[in-house]
Amino acid sequence: MAATILRLSLLTAFFLPTLNMANDRPLTVDDLLALESVGNPQVSPDGQWVAYTISSRDTEEDKRTTQIWMVSSDGGTPIPMTSAGYSASNPRWSPDNKYLSFSASKDEDAKSQVWSLNRLGGEAIQVTNVKQGISGFEWSPDGSRLLLIIQDPKASDLTEDKDDDKKPLPHVIDRMQFKRDYVGYLDRRRRHLYVYTPGSENPTQLTSGDYDDSDPVWSPDGKSIAFVSDRSEDPDLHWGTDVWIVEVDDPDSEIIQVTTNEGRDDSPTWSPDGRSIAYRTATGYDVGGSALTPTRYLASTVIGRDERKILTPELDRNVADPMYSADGKTIYFKLEDSGQVHFASVDKDGRRLIRNLEQQVNVRDFSMAGSKTVLLLGRPDQPAEIYQFNDGTLDQLTNVSNKVLDGVSRASVEKLEFERADGTLVEAFYYRPIDFDSSKRYPTILWLHGGPASQFTYDFSTTGQLYAANGYVVIMPNPRGSVGYGEEFAKGTVAKWGERDFEDVMAAVDYGIELGLVDANRLGVGGWSYGGILTNFVITQTDRFKAAMSGASLGLTTANYGHDHYQLMYELEFGLPWEFPERWVKLSPFSKVQNITTPTLWMGGALDWNVPIINSEQMYIGMKRLGRDTQLVVYPGEHHGIRRPSFEKDRLERWLAWFDERLK
């Protein structure tokens, strides 16, 4: 069905005439591997410095490493704070501004501990020595104590024999939720909160029980800690969380439940006077990342009242990471909206919602302290960097990507909106190839995002830029099921995978043909995770595509029940497989594998328990048995994401080779 345009985005964005000079060269796979990622900005309490992480790929050791850097909040030369010999993460400033603390495991077999480094230099000092390691930490407001997140110990953690860690033991399982990708089989060990005074022998445990505790934040007076936990009768059968408070100096006191809502309450932040807590709330079950994702609102409550006040009731968009201003009058947060993440704010009473940065950028993170605010944001032509934000203006503090991208052409990107036959408005990002000629039509790759509850944004897409650098038009749509367009839109694929979203992505292709960009006879399609799943639904319903790449995707849906880690999601969205067998068959691309004529490359990690490799194996063997053009690539030791640099390179090169051979 042909798509009809209603209107364009604010402008046809980022044609980058100043970046694509005549002697610039195209982006390569090696360029992408050389790119470093900036993350986790933390402004010092006095506002003078910004600590952050830089993650890079060590191609010789074939692994990723992360170091901590800092830069003046007013600009200047960045300073490395940790060495390249080990990975360090989670930077946190001591309240007196003197020390920069972080998490690291310096030895090969060591567990993650808290380390501290004098801001002026010197060697880092190990602060904690927890046998099983720590999962997170935060300094108390007066700097005298540390809040730690520690998982319950296993038997080998309680012995001095290091070989005990290497002795395999049987997995004894009695939980409903018994698997997790990157973790493995789950036992009854949970993550709890502890408080630790540096120099003392052992931390003091604050929370316990058959529950996981997360998102802890100190109260301004340092006497209490707010945290998030699902303390229902069986958390494995319940997809909701509440905000709780525990008293630090009286661990035997009763834990106080702050919120009692049915859905997921998380991301608490204290008001400066300690009387209120703002947090993120959902009005229904929130199965993160799935089609069952309700709108996540900003809310607040006065301690002791159990009265939820939704501060963004008319804003049918997701919020994240709320933070009070120093005077307590304003709450800042990230706001997902129409292919973008804004830096937004609202008065503490829910009045005067403001999008503080009206630019075509994607805000990944922010930090505020003293009088300074910094944003970590990406642009279509530049990976995420750190900027100081002041009254609507941005001053760039880091330029990590420039050493790779200087002299490299980048594709122009525009976001277009078109109307479906039922009146639904759908958006897609269109990447034009380098040296684009408007008189020509180009081979085109339809690239689909994961989730489905996610969205393509005004951010630097390595995939989109790489394909465009190799002569492709790239279409990256936000079909129904995507976030950023309201709850009804996000729930448009509940138990209907491959229906409306299939129609929407095909309409994005048809609109590209109407624009004169797309060669209808040279179409490719691909994606990873739900992007791979939707790819499967595309190629089982149409033969318009000449090549496909399906990564970490779904085959026979019933085979995943109890095999991946989405058991509760399946039950809530699809119903039990023995009660609704027809629905489970309909939602299985494998049941239509005989319809696939598109040459398809199947990929996945051998250890993926998110969307297990059995799915790609099923789809591959079905096509192979039918005599179709297909190939399966399995990456040993990898989970849902491919992290080993040599495998990352292999995957990108295989993508290009597969599409080039069939579309050019």
Locate predicted features.
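Active-site-proximal cap/loop segments of hydrolase catalytic domains
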Residues: 477-664
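Cap/lid segment of the alpha/beta-hydrolase catalytic domain
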Residues: 285, 400-521, 528, 560-563, ...
